[in-house]
Amino acid sequence: MSLSEKGRTYVLFAIVVLACAFGSLTQTVMNSMLGGVEADFGVNASVGQWLTTIYMLVLGITVPAVTFLSQRLSLRNVVFLALGLFLVGGIVDVLAPTFGVLVFGRVLQAVGAGITLPVLQSIAMTRFPKGQNGTAMGIAGIAMGFAPNIGPLIGGALVDSWGWRSFFWLFIAIVVLLILAAFLLIAREDAPMRDARFEGVSFLYSALGFGGLLLAFSNAASLGVQSPLVWVPAVVGIACLVFFVARQKRIEHPLISMRIFESSHFRISFIAQNCLFASFMGITLIVPLYVQGLCGGSAVEAGIAFIPATILAVVVNPLAGILSDKVGARPVVIVAAALLTVGAVSMAFMDENTPLWMTTLMQTVRGMGVSALIGPLNSWGMSGLPREIMMDASAFFAAVRQACASLGTAIMVLVITSLSATAQSGAMNMSFAYQAAFGISAVLAACVLIVVIAKVR
């Protein structure tokens, strides 16, 4: 690889890392901004929650189609498409006169984020030399680990100081800079398969499958598992995903090649990372609820709990990737999973008297484990795959990961809601509701530790 080719690869990678980071950030930033949005538009919490629900739904639906886009368009144009959707979505949201318009802007942003997630992982695994994949994936992990952690902090600070629209002004400015950088610095290239055909039936199954599950998990937190709005989309989602997988195995040109599961590395990484994200994404919502709802803190104080882990993630993510390239993935992911488990188990013992510094310390230990796991586990899992199905693996994994993150969050919120009602009757201490939710995260973290010790070689 010549110096100029290296430079183009690094520039492309940097732009997509930043784009993906902002896509991930916009998913969690709304957790701290919902109160302000609901007050401005006069909607209740159940309606306001659609700002986060619709984002997850559209993100999960979009991701599987990225394989087709990567075949039909050049990588440069795929990046422009994602950034363009970010920009238009941000403009719609900052000017939104009604709640419905605000939701539409979130839909556009979610489509952009759904495009960047698998593209980022594919670049890390296919555009870098074999000995640098772990490092590249570690840097990519900043977008998946650092950005969601900082979302509640940014959202809380902005909504307390300048209102929720200020975030979208900041978002627009950064996206404009990324578009200019992409236009000036990303090299033009031909699309790999100009005659690629879109497999519409497979996409329909995928959209109904992932969309149904995400909708079911989101509704479960507020409606309970007995509601038809939970079990009907869940049944439809599971059935459609079964049809989707069966069709991918049968047709000549699948939307997502199921050959990805022929790799034992990918199967193991797939299981471990889905447990990781179910544990990780739920906590980004539960910690703000705990600090504000149980301990009486402000939105800024809730965000403070994420600051050290967020700062350390910038160092830990690439460092873990570098170490995995040098000494192998196994020692790195075992230490990382141990940190994750220790932090998660410790958080299960927090109550209303736990000081903010202690909450921050435990969240920092847990966050370091997450940061050190994402990159090495990703690169190890994809290392045994043929180059031509890397995008398939990235897209399918990103979609399933989103569903698992939503499931973990829904279960934790459902536990808090159910046990809080019991606590209000005087039957138990309110802190037990949050301890039970943190306990679920701890169990998932322990599952990750068991899998990496037993299977990652």
Give short role names for the model-derived ranges:
Residues L108-I142:
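Cytoplasmic helix-loop-helix junction between adjacent transmembrane helices
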Residues S2-L3, G7, G131, I179-A207, ...:
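Flexible interhelical linker loops that connect adjacent transmembrane helices
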Residues L59, V119-Q121, M125, L177-A191, ...:
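Hydrophobic, membrane-facing alpha-helical anchors
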Residues I172-A191, A207-N219, V235-R250, V448-V456:
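C-terminal membrane-cytosol helix-exit motif in multi-pass small-molecule transporters
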Residues R8-L25, M30-L34, F41-T67, Q71-V79, ...:
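12-transmembrane solute porter fold
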Residues A140-L180, F198-A234:
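Helix-loop-helix hairpin linking two adjacent transmembrane segments in secondary transporters
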Residues I91-V92, A157, G211, L215, ...:
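Alpha-helical transmembrane segments of multipass membrane proteins
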Residues F99, P192-R194, A220-Q226, N353:
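Membrane-interface helix caps and helix-loop-helix hairpins in membrane proteins
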